[in-house]
Design a protein with these regions (language model features):
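Cleavable N-terminal export/targeting peptides
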Residues: 1-41, 408-409
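Subset of outer-membrane beta-barrel
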Residues: 27-409
Length: 409
């Protein structure tokens, strides 16, 4: 039987590992379960982790703004990591890994009733494996057992979209969080996320004749998004009176998309998108060490942080761009800084079969198989990388990758 002292040593080792993660994640604040702040989207991570306002069907973005469910174009999608991410590889801990997967479904009510509404639902899972730890007793350093530390969350999300020319969406997530530090030293909590998203298709609204030239239409969209994540609840391992707060966070962002669309097959010949996002942890500490939640906007300033793009010690700024070529190749770059982070640059690449299927359909109008693929199926591969200007940063060479299947009925 493990003694109280043995458990304390185990917990101390585990919290040391968690502290290293906190250094990278919690924006200078002290909160529990900071793994909730890790961006799970390889697509977004290639663009500086900006995701709250981006126009995308990427299922992983639901983890940080459930309103995306109201604006997705596909009826069903699933995304997963083909290989686990080695989290903070600079630490040299091979069994410190991060993994995630998401299932999304959506229906357009306009197909059944004369209301321009759509409803989406999603389930997602995130796992952080903290590695294998030795269990010792109070009598000495002899190992009397081993255990695997891990944290995970399961989330159900619901989103509603309203298309009245301007596209509006809102969403909510219910999340169950479990932190397993050792047998008998486990903790769990519930939290909620709330999100809003607005997309303004400017070119469509102001141009009566969509063609820029024969058969080609311009694309110019602006979007705004915001989300409150990890709302409510605290988590404790021993004493509920000493519970730690969850990493409540406010995100606000804007995005633009420019491009050209081939009308005949509804294919984007080329697109350029850019996003900027500000994040602020809404947890403060009193002088006696107790915690409190700050106001809904915390230290955020729309003018300073979003328009000017200035980061501060309390506010993290993420920004990035993407170039899409024929809905086939996507090239991404970005960065984030502030809120406890030093400068981190990101890059990524995406490959989609959508453009390939649409291109093949141009010369296969009588080929039912090719047309079915073009109209109803899409496969994505996305990967991204983190690097810093510091040779000893734990984040250097962090790599994410995902595979996604999209089906449109």
């Amino acid at each position: 039987m493990t003694t109280k002292t043995g458990v304390s040593l185990i917990l101390a080792s585990m919290l040391t590992a968690l502290h290293l993660i906190c250094i990278e994640l919690s924006f200078g604040q002290t909160t529990a379960v900071p793994f909730l702040l890790i961006s799970s989207s390889p697509e977004s991570n290639g663009q500086g982790t900006a995701s709250v306002s981006r126009q995308t069907d990427d299922p992983f973005v639901v983890n940080f703004n459930p309103a995306h469910l109201g604006g997705m174009q596909n009826n069903f999608s699933v995304s997963f990591y083909p290989t686990k991410t080695n989290w903070l590889p600079g630490l040299g801990l091979k069994d410190l890994t991060y993994n995630s997967y998401v299932f999304c479904g959506k229906t357009n009510l306009k197909e059944y009733v004369s209301v321009p509404l759509s409803i989406g639902i999603a389930y997602s899972r995130v796992d952080l494996n903290l590695g294998t730890f030795n269990r010792t007793s109070a009598a000495g350093p002899d190992v009397i057992g081993i255990f695997n530390g891990e944290e995970h969350n399961d989330a159900m999300s619901l989103g509603v979209g309203w298309d009245i020319g301007i596209k509006l969406a809102m969403g909510i997530t219910f999340r169950r969080i479990v932190s397993n530090l050792e047998g008998g030293v486990n903790a769990s909590a519930w939290s909620r996320d709330y999100g809003l998203l607005m997309n303004v298709p400017i070119a469509e609204l102001i141009t009566k004749k969509p063609e820029l030239i024969a058969g080609i239409a311009p694309l110019f969209d602006f979007s705004f998004g915001t989300a409150l994540t990890n709302m409510d609840g605290t988590i404790s391992y021993f004493d509920k009176a000493q519970a730690d707060p969850l990493p409540r966070n406010i995100s606000i962002g804007t995005s633009i998309v420019l491009g050209l669309n081939l009308i005949k097959i509804d294919s984007k010949i080329i697109t350029f998108s850019w996003s900027r996002q500000a994040d602020n942890i809404l947890v403060g500490r009193n002088q006696d060490g107790s915690s409190y939640y700050r106001g809904i906007f915390g230290d955020l300033s729309f003018g300073k942080n979003i328009i000017q793009g200035k980061w501060t010690d309390a506010v993290k700024i993420s920004q990035g761009w993407q170039i899409g070529l024929g809905e086939f190749i996507y090239i991404r770059q970005g960065s984030y800084q502030g809120g406890g982070f030093n400068y981190i640059k990101t890059d990524g690449l995406g490959i989609s079969t959508s453009g390939l299927f649409k291109f093949l359909s141009l010369g296969a109008e009588g080929n039912t198989f090719i047309n079915q693929l073009s109209d109803h199926f899409d496969l994505h591969y996305d990967q991204s990388n983190y690097d810093t200007n510091e040779l000893d940063s734990p984040s250097n060479s962090t790599k994410f990758s995902s595979l996604s299947l999209f089906i449109k009925f």
